[in-house]
Amino acid sequence: MIQQALLSVSDKTGIVDFARALHERGVKLLSTGGTAKLLAESSLPVTEVADYTGFPEMLDGRVKTLHPKVHGGILARRDLPEHMAALSEHSIPTIDLLVVNLYPFQQTVAKDECSLADAIENIDIGGPTMLRSAAKNHRDVTVIVDPADYATVLAEMQANNNTVGYETNFMLAKKVFAHTAQYDGAITNYLTSLGADKSHSTRSAYPQTLNLAFDKVQEMRYGENPHQSAAFYRDLKAVDGALANYKQLQGKELSYNNIADADAAWECVKSFDAAHGAACVIIKHANPCGVAIGGTAQEAYEKAFKTDSTSAFGGIIAFNVPLDEAAAQVVAKQFVEVLIAPGFSEGARAVFAAKQNVRVLEIPLGKGVNAYDFKRVGGGLLVQSPDAKNVQPSELRVVTKRHPTPKEMDDLMFAWRVAKFVKSNAIVFCGGGMTLGVGAGQMSRVDSARIASIKAQNAGLTLAGSAVASDAFFPFRDGLDVVVDAGASCVIQPGGSVRDDEVIAAADERNVAMIFTGTRHFRH
């Protein structure tokens, strides 16, 4: 039974209401510093820990709760007579509920102006110590580190005469150890990222020891293949607009491949500014098989679908604008695995309600960029910054005698945006705000060019006057000749080959405009 609680929080969300509910249930309140002041100002009877222990806070608040009367009351096992006798001998009451969250270390070090001294002062000592003590003794002590759990604990106390059951206590204890591990990991990441110089003026983006924290969202029926097991974890620091922030409105449980493909679709469609019109991306096996922009979501979808209607079967479809009923009616005619948008009208929701197997995901648009991209290798982890660079007009360099027309320039920039999301080697034909042919994942660039041309022919789309993007340079003129033979009138590529002069001469020979971006977009 909970008779005495200690509350000491940095995040004071909901703490007054929770403390008042505890008081109304006859629970004695202990607290420290700012939390005690807030509770007292809220007319709640609270005892300062310094008064409770008879030992004042010292060292500018560094020592508040590190006292046997606190930790003895938390750690004593109620089922061991010798533990209870020791408490009695030293006049130590039990502490049955601990509510603690920690100094905001991660928020502090995220600030550009943060110094090492600032970071050190925000390393919590007493908080983690109490949390670990309470979590260790979870058979007898309820411990809360997350304000979201106040309601759960209070409801259980109200239903069971101030008692919280073992299952809830165990769940809360696991949450504590995950939280303190993450907290210590953040400290390690920060300290090992600092340079060895005494001023610590340099800080690496890649700490010597890298600690990552993820929460399990779901276990899956299987992984990439049926013989593989799998689960999906959410980054505790997932940025705004990340796929992991999805809300599933309907449909079957997402599979491993659904999530992988949905991420590719969502990242691609987010790269198109909704302020300039609707965009639609159709993904199959993590590659775009159709991308388009239009005045409406319906127009964008219909154009994207034309690129490769065969591959679009059972694909993942993403929009950068809310989906209305008109677009939903058209999309619903096809077999769709996953549908993603930042919102859905009531009419659109009603259309897909009749197709309950379709997984419908709502994700808010966001500009945030992940700190890292990861790739697992045998016995290690490759870590890099995300490929978030958008080429600026000032970085473009026309290298041919003929300059692209304004229409060609629009098509080139569209093609370049798409090529970034196509597996290397990538060749993308575009025109009129849509993809016309996509060549992906080939070992030679010329083969990707040939495949992209064939895909356009199969779809009945003309490549005359089209724009072509290549994610990396043309190593020889053969790739350029293939796309020009297919009908391309302009090309955008990074440049950087030892044979750039040969490729430029070939473009001039064929009266093709060509732009170098100076940026490569390999994707593996």
Swiss-Prot record:
Q: Which SUPFAM superfamilies match?
A: Cytidine deaminase-like, Methylglyoxal synthase-like
What family does the Swiss-Prot or TrEMBL record give for this protein? Belongs to the PurH family.
The UniProt comment on domains reads: The IMP cyclohydrolase activity resides in the N-terminal region.
Q: What is this protein called?
A: Bifunctional purine biosynthesis protein PurH
Q: What is its EC number?
A: 2.1.2.3, 3.5.4.10
Keyword set, alphabetical order = Hydrolase, Multifunctional enzyme, Purine biosynthesis, Transferase
Q: What is the lineage of its organism?
A: Bacteria, Pseudomonadati, Pseudomonadota, Betaproteobacteria, Burkholderiales
Per the UniProt entry, what species is this protein from, by scientific name?
A: Ralstonia pickettii (strain 12J)
Q: Which gene encodes it?
A: purH
GO cellular component, as recorded: cytosol
Q: HAMAP family, per this entry?
A: PurH (MF_00139)
Please give the start and end residues of each transmembrane region: none
Q: In which pathway does it act?
A: Purine metabolism; IMP biosynthesis via de novo pathway; 5-formamido-1-(5-phospho-D-ribosyl)imidazole-4-carboxamide from 5-amino-1-(5-phospho-D-ribosyl)imidazole-4-carboxamide (10-formyl THF route): step 1/1; Purine metabolism; IMP biosynthesis via de novo pathway; IMP from 5-formamido-1-(5-phospho-D-ribosyl)imidazole-4-carboxamide: step 1/1
Q: Name one GO biological process term.
A: 'de novo' IMP biosynthetic process
Could you tell me which residue ranges the MGS-like domain spans?
Answer: 1-145
